[in-house]
Regions:
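Phosphate-binding beta-loop-alpha motif at adenosine-nucleotide cofactor sites
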Residues: 80-87, 152-158
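ATP-dependent NMP and nucleoside kinases share a basic, alpha-helical "lid"
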Residues: 48, 52, 87-128, 137-146
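Short hydrophobic/aromatic-enriched beta-strand-loop microsegments
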Residues: 39-42, 104-106, 131
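Conserved GTP-binding G-domain of TRAFAC-class P-loop NTPases and closely related GTPase folds
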Residues: 2-21, 26-29, 34, 38, ...
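Generic beta-sheet signal
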Residues: 16-18, 79-83, 107
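Conserved catalytic network of the ASCE P-loop NTPase/AAA+ motor domain
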Residues: 72-76, 102-104, 148
Length: 158
């Protein structure tokens, strides 16, 4: 079995972490499906750990797991890792920027700037519905990502 050093030698020139940013129902997961990529997804990790993608009682454990898996992907040389979660505030995004700096890679944000009412309407047609009041609270908390946070690129999807 190869050691970590051999994996590091296979690294691509500049690895990237790409964070999805936006409300539930804004199109983050659909966007990634269309790209044909498998992201590190907070919903998928919740489902894996608790057999329930809506279980918010394990929030810290879910994001700790995502960051662990992200670091492992960087160490073995994966060129791009997409992270699918809401990432509403600079504080929620900061750990990924720190990881990117530690590993010498770029970190980008893809911001889904979709009106709240459209997100609520889309969300109401899902299997796992986030209550409208929770969506409103999330929208009030949402701070659009900026390059000043440490992103090498911010892409806005409308």
């Amino acid at each position: 079995m190869p050691n970590d050093t051999s994996f590091r030698r296979r690294r691509h020139k500049r690895q990237r972490i790409v964070l999805m940013v936006g409300l539930p129902g804004s199109g983050k997961s659909t966007y990634l499906e269309r790209l044909g990529v498998t992201p590190l997804s907070s919903d998928a990790i919740r489902q894996l750990l608790a057999d329930d993608a809506t279980d918010q009682t394990i929030h810290k454990r879910v994001f700790s797991t995502i960051r662990y898996l992200l670091r492992q992907r960087l160490v073995i040389g994966r060129a791009v890792t997409y992270v699918d979660a809401t990432h509403l505030t600079p504080g929620e995004r900061r750990p990924y920027i720190k990881i990117a700096r530690q590993h010498g890679c770029d970190v980008e944000a893809v911001f889904f700037d979709v009106p709240l009412e459209i997100c609520i309407a889309r969300n109401s047609g899902r299997k796992r519905v986030v209550p409208a009041e929770a969506m409103r609270k999330m929208a009030a908390k949402l701070v659009p990502p900026r390059a000043a946070e440490g992103f090498s690129r911010v892409t806005v999807v409308r």
